[in-house]
């Protein structure tokens, strides 16, 4: 409870951190946004240890370190608004309902993307618990931890491309925006190949990091799970980049459809169907199958309005 209370108390700072970082990045200062993010993350890692052990604060100390990290990031990003090159200023103004509605529309895709990890975790845990018990759930914990890192990499590619795509869209440069989409998609594919090559060659040691009890059964489940599950990133990278592109060119409905498919509809449907047909391997295969289905949907959506964006 102590951890949750401290964490929830600082929730507004987490939200503001996303907003401020996005403004700084889109206003031509991505380096500062990156430095702010890195400093916040490093502060969290270092002070997690300091607050928990040398200072003896335990879990509340870990919560405090996590909670303060976005405050530090916001403080660093705020430097941008005092620069002469900044085109963004804080002014007193009533909120515009029209702009708020537009922002909410464009934000649905990101919301669904963030929510999807929770949906996937819940569905997979329930299915694996029914199929093979607690050991299978522990194996999925290993897969999910590495999957979070992989997803963050592709989110980084999408967020890096987004301001450039938006700039092209603002200039009515549809060809330039499409070139950036191709570049981002190619980068995502190359990263997926490199990621899978490392994973395939080092699956055993990678799994062993989270297998302190040396459970042979858990290692076996996680080993096969990693190799099947991570095939999905060959499609997921493209889907994440494409969803970011669609949002950047003011196509919120298509962006939301892509995110909703990969985050909720396709992943749940594939999990239920494939687990019934193939057991545990079907659960692992649900992720690549759902991402492949979403990639087909995304290609259709991109092609349908290709002449306008």
Question: Which residues are covered by each model-predicted region?
Answer:
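Hydrophobic faces of transmembrane alpha-helices in multi-pass small-molecule transporters and flippases
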Residues: 4, 8, 31-38, 76-79, ...
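Helix-terminus/linker motif at the lipid-water interface of multi-pass membrane proteins
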Residues: 50-57, 118-145, 149, 167, ...
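Transmembrane alpha-helix boundary and packing residues in multipass membrane permease domains
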Residues: 22, 49, 66, 79, ...
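Short alpha-helical transmembrane segments in multi-pass integral membrane proteins
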Residues: 1-10, 54-108, 165-232, 273-309
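Hydrophobic transmembrane alpha-helices of multi-pass small-molecule transporters
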Residues: 44-48, 74-78, 148-152, 196, ...
